[in-house]
Amino acid sequence: MLILGIDPGTAIMGYGLIEKKGNRLFPVDYACWRTPAHTPMPERLLMLYHEIEAYIKEKQPHHVAVEELFFNRNTTTAISVGQARGVVLLAAAQCGLPVYEYTPLQVKQAVAGYGRADKQQIQQMVRALLGLQEIPKPDDTADALAIAICHAHSVNLLNRMGGAL
């Protein structure tokens, strides 16, 4: 099963594609999409949409996992992340893919086993769980891989409980 994890953002959107074979996870591809800083927001969102849609069509993941929007003190940041999430949801829906959403707490618990794990602990666990030599950079990429790992663990749990994905 191929799982595409996405860490939404309008300037930098991290993505990580992992393959789940049995109980093992393998990194397939990870990087980020970037948009030019002074480009109007509608154009940035359109650029991201085209990148995501093309990537999904090329790589053919089975599931898309994305981080849920959480309360942010910076309203402008929260709005732009929400817009980026909308683009992810739209692109996945247009390609007929199911989208699974996880809170930052769920991602931390799934990856590090502790909901208050810091960014460095999560990055180290992503590196270890995927057998990578180095921590993926930038942080958005490591976050996207963590989201994909979280979904892979959720698939295991749902399968054990008899739920279908």
From Swiss-Prot:
Record-listed Mg(2+) 2 binding positions: E67
Active site, per annotation: D7, E67, D140
Entries under CDD domains matching the protein: RuvC (cd16962)
Record-level GO BP terms: DNA recombination; DNA repair
SUPFAM superfamilies: Ribonuclease H-like
Cofactor note: Binds 2 Mg(2+) ion per subunit.
UniProt-listed Enzyme Commission number(s): 3.1.21.10
Membrane-spanning residues: none
MF terms (GO), sorted A to Z: crossover junction DNA endonuclease activity; DNA binding; magnesium ion binding
Location of the protein in the cell: Cytoplasm
GO cellular component: a single term: cytoplasm
Names of required cofactors: Mg(2+)
Matching InterPro entries: RNaseH-like_sf, RNaseH_sf, X-over_junc_endoDNase_Mg_BS, X-over_junc_endoDNase_RuvC
Enzymatic reactions: Endonucleolytic cleavage at a junction such as a reciprocal single-stranded crossover between two homologous DNA duplexes (Holliday junction)
Residues reported in the UniProt entry to bind Mg(2+) 1: D7, D140
Function: The RuvA-RuvB-RuvC complex processes Holliday junction (HJ) DNA during genetic recombination and DNA repair. Endonuclease that resolves HJ intermediates. Cleaves cruciform DNA by making single-stranded nicks across the HJ at symmetrical positions within the homologous arms, yielding a 5'-phosphate and a 3'-hydroxyl group; requires a central core of homology in the junction. The consensus cleavage sequence is 5'-(A/T)TT(C/G)-3'. Cleavage occurs on the 3'-side of the TT dinucleotide at the point of strand exchange.
Subunit structure: Homodimer which binds Holliday junction (HJ) DNA. The HJ becomes 2-fold symmetrical on binding to RuvC with unstacked arms; it has a different conformation from HJ DNA in complex with RuvA. In the full resolvosome a probable DNA-RuvA(4)-RuvB(12)-RuvC(2) complex forms which resolves the HJ.
PANTHER family: CROSSOVER JUNCTION ENDODEOXYRIBONUCLEASE RUVC
Family assignment from sequence similarity: Belongs to the RuvC family.
NCBIfam families, sorted: PRK00039.2-1, ruvC
Protein name: Crossover junction endodeoxyribonuclease RuvC
Biological source species: Desulfitobacterium hafniense (strain Y51)
Chain's gene name: ruvC
